[in-house]
Amino acid sequence: MRVFDFDGTIYDGESLFDLYLYSARHDPKVFRYIAPVLRYAVKYKLGRATLEQMEYGVGKMTEGYLAELSRSKRVASVEQLVDDFWDRNYSRIKPWYQPESDDVILTASFGLTVGEACRRLGVRNLVASEVDVGTMKVTYLNFSTNKAKRFRELYGPDAVVDEFYTDSKFDQPMIDMARHAFMVKGNTITQVK
């Protein structure tokens, strides 16, 4: 099986950040959630935030953001906003990525957002951060070591990862698990294992 990180790997950018910007065009009130989430994201990328800090900080900010959107009179629904976002941004899926039936997308982004991209790609296997759409509460953040842990919970301890693709050294637990691993920068793919 092939396993892919999503943001920066097969998607050119950070989809959650891009969705924030897209949604702010529809309801500028959500701008107040962008700076705190960016701060946590930068700390995480630099290795300066613990998983617990990410879970608390990003979880709380995301809950506020999603609740604000779901109450907004300018947005039909969060699901419709996500669908419209992918109508506009689906072309940012990198051209080298050709989906296969058993591919797994393993991402820190939310299933609520990346799930629509996976549906359009024909990818059925998504391991992502989770939100209860009824309450808009974050129920699971798929960051850092949680990625490998969650992958093993869902696919079992004996699941064989033939190839793993990422843009981040923070995915080292998945790199270690894979038979072959690749680092992606732009459209350049370099085998690292």
Feature locations, PLM:
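Short, functional N-terminal and low-complexity linear motifs
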Residues: R2-T9, A24-R25, K60-Y65, L81-F85, ...
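A structural signal for alpha-helix termini and helix-coil/disorder junctions
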Residues: R25-H26, Y44, R48, G64, ...
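Metal-dependent phosphoesterase signature
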Residues: M54-R92
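Short, mixed-charge, low-aromatic patches
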Residues: D12-L16, A35-L38, G47-M54, L69-R74, ...
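A general boundary/transition motif marking the beginning of the first structured unit of a protein
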Residues: D7, L46-A49, L66-S70, F85, ...
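C-terminal cap/substrate-recognition subdomain and adjoining C-terminal extension
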Residues: Q80-K193
